[in-house]
Amino acid sequence: YDPRSWLGGRYDVDSRRVDILASETGWEVCNMGENGREIPRSAPDLPADTDLLIFMLGTNDLLQGCSPEQAAGKLKHVLSQLSLKPNQILLIVPPPMAPGQWVPSQQLIDHSRTFAGCCRRLAQQLGIRFADAGEWNISLAYDGVHFTEQGHRAFAANLLEVLR
């Protein structure tokens, strides 16, 4: 998602984390991300040959008023429904929000930081893989939520390290 455009566009293929991951690995990567997507109530339909599900949601839930604990509870509910083995699931907590057009309060920033700890504990509880994108120096756009093009590249580079 490119927040610079009026209706929200997309960065070029060379700048999107999903496309960078596919290019660098040769893997078939299915991007199920949607602008504004919140944690679903039920597990997504996955292809039968899914090797790895990388799950990174929660920011929009926090923006819509969920507490970090409520968002983590929603994650637990959906992740518990998956028919994948624990080592086939990688939960990535989004980087913390920053002051910006979509982030009018310090409380949202604090909640996004608290959410990271909730997700870490959830991953341990479920025995699934975990990564904290807050540790990856991801640059965020003026809205305080979405990645810049450089942020996408940094995310992809760090994710590749986690997956190696």
Residue ranges and their predicted role:
Residues 38-73, 96-97:
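Oxyanion-hole/transition-state-stabilizing segment in secreted/luminal serine hydrolases
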